């Protein structure tokens, strides 16, 4: 009698194909039955769903069906039986995070007065087992959701909800956000080929933000260095572009998601005011904010105008109430005598769609304005692949690093930490995991992909050579140990324990 098969469905938004997996052995419940069950001898996970999109497209063309391979016959170092070398598959080093979670769990389990090394080892082993089990459950649930197997997915979600604790270890906390995303995706499952729903007119998820989300975003700005790092690098680049200019103009795409008080531009105004008088002093600064929440943006503009006036800077502030996709060159008034720069902080990924048209149009429109520089800060991770399972694994790895950093900075029961995790990062995670089509706004991409997109739109990279200053900025602002800054092909990348988080880049026409 032939063994039962479980069809794992790989899907993009328009088509599907199946991989038949053997469920007759204990490997059946393992998320990837053609890989060995995880044990301490495996240093890294090689995840087949991290294969490049090109490989997936070849798979679809050939309409391959994967033959079940037992763990005893599978060798990670061998590629003779595979059409794609396993060595070419990007590795997601979840083991590094599991070791970290293991230490957290061990510390939580130990009595305060114990000095027993046996207790330490036992607690660490229990913590590792729990963490590994949670990872396996998440992946198995993601596969069930991808297969539209509501019964199996619901069963796994029930177990996950009892283990993914909002106030647990850092991995339990990030898992709770992914559980929410999987649950939402399960409820939104529709027959293949049906409509994806109506898209709201938004620039980013903050356009429809609740008060809780707005508070969480302010806390993220104050606590995490991601956005402040972007502001520091962007302002330094803008100041360099404005050197020797009397009339300057900044076009801010999204106005930093509507952060109150205009923190980035207060810093720029202060720096401009400190420049020497005479030819080096700016005679007029114009800021054009692009966004849909006109009342919020105008309030920021009023505050900035008062601040600039007190420092002797002539500021003209205006708002263009449009999203980026509908923005036209005539919407932005550009004077011939002024130096123009365009600033984009965590904005352009929201314009990335399944087709290249939307983003290309926006970039070409910006290019047509002939700015001296376009400064861009984006999340440096691949969350825009066409296949759900690939996005799921990439985002799990990325947000695990962020939640690990929060664990290092804040106590377990800190309410500010919980608000950031559940009302900001969870919203990003849910958008990546549960949404498709126009509703999926969080389409983060790696620097190399942005480099190709910018080149197609006519931009040339302008290397940012200030890695030493950026490292000094980390020290000066007493940023938590574990954050790193590296230069990567002219971009500055802020990472957590070498895992890239955000990347800043500069582009010229």
From Swiss-Prot:
Annotated segments matching region Leucine repeat I (LRI): 132-198
Induction and repression of expression: Induced in root epidermal cells and outer cortical cells upon root colonization by arbuscular mycorrhiza (AM) fungi (e.g. Rhizophagus irregularis), especially in arbuscule-containing cells under low phosphate (Pi) conditions.
Limits of the GRAS domain: 125-508
Tissue specificity of this protein: Expressed in roots under low phosphate (Pi) conditions.
Localization per Swiss-Prot or TrEMBL: Nucleus
Gene disruption: observed consequences: Strongly reduced number of arbuscules undergoing accelerated degeneration during root colonization by arbuscular mycorrhiza (AM) fungi (e.g. Rhizophagus irregularis).
Protein keywords: Nucleus, Transcription, Transcription regulation
Keyword rRNA-binding: no
GO terms for biological process, alphabetical: arbuscular mycorrhizal association; cellular response to phosphate starvation; detection of phosphate ion; regulation of DNA-templated transcription; response to symbiotic fungus
SAW as annotated region, ranges: 434-508
Matches recorded under InterPro entries: TF_GRAS
Residue ranges of the motif VHIID: 248-252
GO cellular component labels: nucleus
Keyword Protein biosynthesis found: no
Region (PFYRE): 340-431
Function field: Transcription factor acting as a regulator of arbuscular mycorrhiza (AM)-related genes (e.g. PT4, STR and RAM2). Required for the morphogenesis of arbuscules upon symbiosis with AM fungi (e.g. Rhizophagus irregularis). Also involved in restricting mycorrhizal colonization of the root meristem.
UniProt protein name: GRAS family protein RAD1
Provenance organism: Lotus japonicus
